[in-house]
Amino acid sequence: AVGYVAYSSATDTNGKILQINGVLPSEKTIDNNSYPLCRDYYLAYNGELTDVEQDFLTYVKSKGQDIVKQYCIQADSTTTFLSDKSEGKILIEGSTSMEPMVKALADDYQKQNPNAEIEVKATDSSRGITAVISGECDFAMSSRELKDYEAELLETKVIGKDAIAIVINEENPLENLTIKQLTGLYNGTYKNWDDLS
């Protein structure tokens, strides 16, 4: 069997992580994009932000990066943050991969700004993007790039980076897959490990 998991949670995985195109996922190979299955974590939003939404986004891109690096590779260097104490409620919906990190960001931000109330709802990236486009939420959590039409409608900020780690049984002697082989495993071109030779 072959499976996949977010690299950031791969330490909890029983199994062997494979190289893809000869590259293992690591902080270095994800940060420099040499690992082929990297992905950015985005917060997407509709145009103008309220004061509290802007304050939260400023926090995420500055002091919040301390929280981000506990979950994945930070997108920005950590800097100081002083909340303007804006009042309001923020609704965030989307990626289940991002939900624990964004909840931690929301919790820490609300300590910085007790006038803010943030609700984080895990669905999936596409549902979050649809919800922010339709005005059902203020930010979408997306662990995929936006499609062209989505990118025309929304602004995005990269808040962290991660990768998809491909995992197999530890007893399997395989060490590396090409992208073509990986695609073939998932689309049924290859039915068993011997087909990869």
Cite the ranges covered by each PLM segment.
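Exported/periplasmic ABC-transporter solute-binding proteins
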Residues: 1-197
